[in-house]
């Protein structure tokens, strides 16, 4: 009631609660010795079943059958047509792959499958020998699989030559549907937010780190199992929320198919003409230098065109232009909008107008050069393509965004931007 009266949003409420250490403790679960139960009151850490060959995988699959009922059980509907999901979470398989999900260069260190509290743990080096049997399991049980980040997990699995059809439930997408104004950058952040877990060693269990030594560290495996437990706990908690909000059909009919399409787009990447990009960068660099030289000629000195303080001295002290609006620090603003206004108002002042025109041209072409350079840097050397990441769970409005590189910051208001 207090938070409501103070109009605190979800993020502020979460920060306040965490500051009082009201969250549940989970870090100790990953620090216990291997021969301990390795469980906590808040997370059910699964029992690890190390898979070394196809026979061991077959044995685990056989033991998991009893706990792996079909989501269609006790219902006349096909799994994809169900309106609710929480009632069948106990008969699903949680999947989590540790590794890098970077499009165009993914990697995996370990894959885990958990059913009924027992987790099959497959190191990356083992998977090649069991891939056919593992793929058959994934194909036959996709509508019973629970993941955190279907798109990201698909990239990691693809690095192993594995394919995952649209799963039953995605805790990352579910969290976005339940709280669209909250974005978790990692599994740990999602668990901390939705499960109120205090992760004291969050940096130590960061997602996406690969150990290429080939040795299995018991501490690393305990952290892997902790991640597996987080996925299961998030699934149980968020499934109830999704049912309460009647969003399960939205999750399965819109969000998961979109994730599948985005995964394909990221994996294929965008073909680019590397030579043309290089030529454009060099041309923009020349234009930026020419504009800088012109600006210096009008200024009468080699003023730093990136320095607001030096620009203010030239524009307002030397050239006598009327100052722009003040910033919070007390200085005058020299952003693009303010400079454009000054250029319009300085038409009768040939020196000032020439300087401002050259300055604006320098800024514009320099920005275009930097954008093209970022695209060149993002080209994958293996296939000559750009593999951006499309963010599906960032904007509360539901729009997509792209990062690494950001393809949405390319200006298209002029011919040069459209050429890019």
Where are these regions (language model features)?
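Short alpha-helix plus adjacent loop in nuclease-associated cores
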Residues: 168-229
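Nucleic-acid-processing active sites and adjacent nucleic-acid-binding tracks
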Residues: 114-147, 270
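Short amphipathic alpha-helical segments and helix-helix/interface helices
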Residues: 58-61, 110, 131-139, 154
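Short glycine-rich phosphate-binding loop at a beta-alpha junction
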Residues: 143-151, 302-304
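Conserved ANL (AMP-binding/adenylate-forming) active-site segment centered on the GW(Y/F)…HTG consensus within
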Residues: 417-420
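Short active-site loop/helix that positions an aromatic residue
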Residues: 150-161, 172-181, 191, 313-319
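Conserved "right-hand" nucleotidyltransferase catalytic core of DNA-directed polymerases
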Residues: 1-124, 182, 210-415
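A structural signal for short, well-ordered beta-strand segments and their strand-loop junctions
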Residues: 93-96, 145-148, 167-168
